[in-house]
């Protein structure tokens, strides 16, 4: 298991330390480190502190903040930026951009699990500037070009 440095910025997390819920879990739950409930009306967004800061340190790693599937499907609560990308050299607190895309008001409770954090490998690349690409079967065919079924 790869280990990274984590700062706990909210003491309430000392009893809710980040952990994988199951041996096969890809993401760690992020909690809403709020002092009071926050109400999100339909269409509203807000930044919610996670109470955590991470330092991946390895440029071969990045972290992604992703929505929790149940919140999105059942309540319409997703991420305002769709995916949050945490670079390996970022050391500040992780915030969750919560967006209520649903039709009903939703209240985020203090310490509620609001998103998940997934650490992924990253490959930085260099560019070869070319005038043309070698021919491929697909070429520049875009959206829908590989068929419906």
From Swiss-Prot:
GO terms for biological process: dUMP biosynthetic process; dUTP catabolic process. SUPFAM superfamilies: dUTPase-like (SSF51283). Pathway: Pyrimidine metabolism; dUMP biosynthesis; dUMP from dCTP (dUTP route): step 2/2. The keyword Metal-binding applies. Its cofactor is Mg(2+). Keywords: Hydrolase, Magnesium, Metal-binding, Nucleotide metabolism. This enzyme is involved in nucleotide metabolism: it produces dUMP, the immediate precursor of thymidine nucleotides and it decreases the intracellular concentration of dUTP so that uracil cannot be incorporated into DNA. NCBIfam families: dut, PRK00601.1. Belongs to the dUTPase family. This is Deoxyuridine 5'-triphosphate nucleotidohydrolase. The gene is dut.
């Amino acid at each position: 298991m790869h280990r990274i440095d984590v700062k706990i910025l909210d003491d309430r997390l000392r009893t809710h330390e980040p952990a994988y819920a199951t041996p096969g879990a890809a993401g760690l739950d992020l909690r809403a480190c709020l002092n009071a409930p926050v109400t999100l009306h339909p269409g509203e967004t807000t930044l919610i502190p996670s109470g955590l800061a991470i330092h991946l340190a390895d440029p071969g790693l990045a972290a992604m903040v992703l929505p929790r599937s149940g919140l999105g499907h059942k309540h319409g609560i997703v991420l305002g930026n769709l995916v949050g990308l945490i670079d390996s050299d970022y050391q500040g607190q992780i915030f969750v951009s919560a967006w209520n895309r649903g039709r009903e008001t939703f209240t985020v409770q203090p310490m509620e699990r609001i998103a998940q954090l997934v650490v992924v490998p990253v490959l930085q690349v260099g560019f070869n500037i070319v005038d043309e690409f070698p021919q491929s079967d697909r070429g520049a065919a875009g959206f829908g070009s590989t068929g419906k079924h």
